[in-house]
């Protein structure tokens, strides 16, 4: 069994578990073995939902009284892609020239290993004056239906309450500790289906081409910026992700066009206000095109991606920032950039910050992390844990 205080040995063991969402593949079993040896109680609830795979999760806790700190993360990883493109096999955890290679090294088995090693180092020196829990899901890289959101609810129903949480997502950029996340933009997706009538291009009067209306709808979505950004957030942006007619022929007017888009929005918007704005823009085109007849459009919203949030707990941010400065000599940038994470669920239960390894190789071929970065993150986590319970 790897040494508890060595994050690299634990990371190697975790990488060797091919835990592609939603497969547990032994990763949670390794964590359970480690955590029980450290004195944690461990539970592994499995959650299910319609049309989704069952997902096993892990909740471990040590202590009962005093401040309660949660570390949240995920043991699942994205697929490695073509194995021949990798310098080393993605599920072997090979170390070469000061780097450990493997899928999940950065996102985010590395941070899990660092936090556990940091806690083991603290416990070698002093007891924890409070409670520590680890909330690890196997459904972060997937639909995120049977993971953190249900694990939080399950734990809360058992009476669990947390004072603060840290999520080990790879927030650092060039070096460990140069950036932490104190909030995230919201995310919402939409699908516009423009219905037409299929026909021969030589007889347009017998058909209804959906593409001209689709073009006008796209213009309505993209011609005017949503905003210019705020003090804590960059500008909201709407991005088209697909435009599809399902038609490869040059002599057929298509029957429909499907437009998919995503919006990342800042704190100038609520989800409801943003939906109203988009629907208003489209409605202007809708009426102009007499859309009670072909062609016409239908709009569907996908709303489970997370709302905008900003953590205003200065004490938590200060503890983490001070720990980073003590170890690295520099204070971190507090940012809200990037995509969504499971922090969007945790913020409904307690203040949450995100901090982990540099993410420049996450989801890429030859994903890797330096051994120096692993040690730096472990030392910072150790300092953070000590100061949190001081």
UniProtKB/Swiss-Prot annotation:
A Pfam short name: M20_dimer
Reaction(s) the record says it catalyses: N-succinyl-(2S,6S)-2,6-diaminopimelate + H2O = (2S,6S)-2,6-diaminopimelate + succinate
Enzyme Commission number(s): 3.5.1.18
Keyword Ribonucleoprotein annotated: no
GO molecular function: acetylornithine deacetylase activity; cobalt ion binding; succinyl-diaminopimelate desuccinylase activity; zinc ion binding
Pathway it works in: Amino-acid biosynthesis; L-lysine biosynthesis via DAP pathway; LL-2,6-diaminopimelate from (S)-tetrahydrodipicolinate (succinylase route): step 3/3
Protein name according to UniProt: Succinyl-diaminopimelate desuccinylase
Organism of origin: Bartonella bacilliformis (strain ATCC 35685 / KC583 / Herrer 020/F12,63)
């Amino acid at each position: 069994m790897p040494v508890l205080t060595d994050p690299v040995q634990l990371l190697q063991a975790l990488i060797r578990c091919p835990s592609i969402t939603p497969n547990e593949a032994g990763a949670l079993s390794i964590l359970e073995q480690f955590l029980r040896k450290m004195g944690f109680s461990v539970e592994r609830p499995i959650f299910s939902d319609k049309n989704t795979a069952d997902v096993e999760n892990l909740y471990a806790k040590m202590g009962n009284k005093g401040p309660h700190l949660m570390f949240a993360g995920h043991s699942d990883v994205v697929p490695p892609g073509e194995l021949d493109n990798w310098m080393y096999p993605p599920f072997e955890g090979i170390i070469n020239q000061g780097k450990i290679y493997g899928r999940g090294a950065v996102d985010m088995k590395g941070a899990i290993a660092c936090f556990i090693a940091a806690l083991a180092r603290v416990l070698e020196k002093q007891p924890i004056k409070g409670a520590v829990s680890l909330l690890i899901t196997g459904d972060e890289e997937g639909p995120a239906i049977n993971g953190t959101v249900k694990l939080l609810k399950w734990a809360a129903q058992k009476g669990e309450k947390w004072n603060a949480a840290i999520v080990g997502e790879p927030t650092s950029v060039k070096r460990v500790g140069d950036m932490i996340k104190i909030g995230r933009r919201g995310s919402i997706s939409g699908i516009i289906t423009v219905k037409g009538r299929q026909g021969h291009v030589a007889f347009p009067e017998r058909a209804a081409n959906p593409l001209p209306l689709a073009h006008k709808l796209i213009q309505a979505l993209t011609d005017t910026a949503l905003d210019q950004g705020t003090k804590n957030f960059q500008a909201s942006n709407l991005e088209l992700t697909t435009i599809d007619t399902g038609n490869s022929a040059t002599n057929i007017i298509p029957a429909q066009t499907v437009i998919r888009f995503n919006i990342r929005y800042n704190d100038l918007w609520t989800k409801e206000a943003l939906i109203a704005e988009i629907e208003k823009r489209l409605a202007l085109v809708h009426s102009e095109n007499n859309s009670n007849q072909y062609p016409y459009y239908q709009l569907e919203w996908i709303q489970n991606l997370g709302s905008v949030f900003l953590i205003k707990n200065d004490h938590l941010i200060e503890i983490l920032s001070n720990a980073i400065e003590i170890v690295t000599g520099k204070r971190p940038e507090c940012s809200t950039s990037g995509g969504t994470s499971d922090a969007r669920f945790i913020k409904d239960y307690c203040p949450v910050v995100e901090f982990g390894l540099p993410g420049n190789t996450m989801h890429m071929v030859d994903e890797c992390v330096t051994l120096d970065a692993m040690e730096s993150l472990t030392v910072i986590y150790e300092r953070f844990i000590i100061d949190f319970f001081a």
